[in-house]
Amino acid sequence: MKMPKSIGLVHFIGIGGIGMSGIAEVLHNLGHRVQGSDQAESANVQRLRAKGIEVFVGHKPENLGDAEVVVVSTAIKKSNPELVAAREKLLPVVRRAEMLAELMRFRNAIAIGGTHGKTTTTSMVAALLEAGQLDPTVINGGIINAYGTNARMGEGEWMVVEADESDGTFLKLPADVAVVTNIDPEHLDHYGNFDAVRAAFRQFVENVPFYGFGVMCLDHPEVQALVGRIEDRKVVTYGENPQADVRFFNVRNEGTKSIFDVEIRRRRTGRVFSFKDLTLPMPGRHNISNACAAIAVANRLDISEEAIRKGLSTFGGVKRRFTLTGTWNGVQVFDDYGHHPVEIKAVLKAARESCKGRIIAVHQPHRFSRLSSLFEDFANCFNDADSILLSPVYAAGEDPIEGIDSEALVSRIRSGGHRDVRYLASPDQLAGIISTIAQPGDFVVLLGAGNITQWAAALPSELQALSGKSE
């Protein structure tokens, strides 16, 4: 049985969250009555209101109104007054992933999983399906620039979703195609150990039906090892690895644009497809790898080479993924969500490949627990930056951990031999420092999952105000 239209008013607690807002939007577009609440005003809240969805600011029992179903994310605590009221009324309480799973039952579904790269890969798969006239429905974990939103309601038979592994609920998603970009030791607070993370991703792939398939990155050692453990399911591999079924090679850079070739081998038939000089309007091998995953999916869905070329060459990217916020005196300022050492390293490497000048990295560590568990990895992920500025940790509600802070990380990076790493005590100091060290041709890359995105947006105008020069 699929979810009926007659389920009544659906109330989302925390509707402004990036995952919740997309589900709410698609439910609304399907004709369901939707409302919600969030702690504060935000761009997502305003976007939902503009679509006719009522959103309350603040959490109060009376916000439920006539709601017959309540949707919550794992970020919502059991003591939340709306959740308490819903349970007192014996209303069904649905987890975010469970509601996403219900939506997926209406379509053939592609779920994008992995520790990093999910949002960009989801966007790329959506772009290729759209270019192939498949008109997909999309629910993403980030704002897709082409849509101005993280959700899209299509009329086609395919749905593309980002599968969040952080709390294990991605195993509830009924995917026909499961993509795994990489597997790193993240979210150990939920899983307990890395072996449990590995087991979850194996189940994620093996959950696809026999007529479905997995798409797995052969460049990542953990994923390559997992490929050998997958039982009784079809797997398509991709990457730069010469053994990959969908392999990219001959990579060239033109500014912030990537050009590359792809060769696709069908194992059963031995048939080979070659795509020469594909263009992606963003730098970095990690982005080419994500594009390769999308190509693997598109090829299996019989999307033409012409459509694949068009979808990649016109790909508009994702908000906060190496997003240019402005230019000052020949210096380009970028905003990026990267907050894990693997992500930071990949972004800075991509910047290095496309920048003619120096790389100035500004990072706001996110969560004391992450900095503590990955301290040495953080100390070694900034090698492609000529200068590093580290701000205080964005706690995200966590308590401090003794000896784990940005000043300690500055000392560790400096002791490892980096020539220019500094502590940024306040964002008020940022423009002044950048104005003295940045030269024409340099990239300033601001990285983090906290409020550093606001600094990135403001920095070009702040630099202009200091110097009176801009472009």
Curated annotation (Swiss-Prot):
Chief subcellular location: cytoplasm
Cytoplasm listed as a keyword: yes
Keywords carried by this UniProt record: ATP-binding, Cell cycle, Cell division, Cell shape, Cell wall biogenesis/degradation, Cytoplasm, Ligase, Nucleotide-binding, Peptidoglycan synthesis
An example molecular function term from Gene Ontology annotations: UDP-N-acetylmuramate-L-alanine ligase activity
Reactions performed catalytically: UDP-N-acetyl-alpha-D-muramate + L-alanine + ATP = UDP-N-acetyl-alpha-D-muramoyl-L-alanine + ADP + phosphate + H(+)
GO cellular component terms listed in the entry, alphabetical order: cytoplasm
Family to which this protein belongs: Belongs to the MurCDEF family.
Protein name: UDP-N-acetylmuramate--L-alanine ligase
Annotated source species: Allorhizobium ampelinum (strain ATCC BAA-846 / DSM 112012 / S4) (Agrobacterium vitis (strain S4))
Encoding gene, per UniProt annotation: murC
